[in-house]
Amino acid sequence: MIHGFLKACTVSPALRVADCAFNTQQTIAAMQRAALDGAQLAVFPELGLTGYTCGDLFFQQPLQRAAAKGLAAVLEASAGLDLVALVGLPVAVDGKLYNCAAVVCHGKLLGLVPKTHLPNYGEFYEKRQFNPAPAGVRTLR
């Protein structure tokens, strides 16, 4: 930090719908570039490990497992970086699916932040796939 400020960046990597392996590679490469450029905080797209437009594929176990595997790879890659990254992925907890931002730093998962306000109009059908963050709940188990 310089004078109380940190360098932050938003990242828009090339993504492929439902191709978690490709999206994970793109995310890791962008994290490494951001850290080399001196960023201390990198914010990635919503549902970036799966792609936003997976629709009902979000309910499929193979996609959920691939996203979790991608997050594990991101965690491992972050171990040597001086960077906090927010990476988007779907997370299933107790039979409910959440649209989450994973907070990653130095090889650790610092938290999962489920989306609170889900749009349900026009091309946005998030309430079909996802549950909103439970009101007043600070921890998902």
Describe the role of every protein-language-model region.
Residues M1-R141:
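Enzyme catalytic cores with a strong preference for nitrogen-chemistry domains
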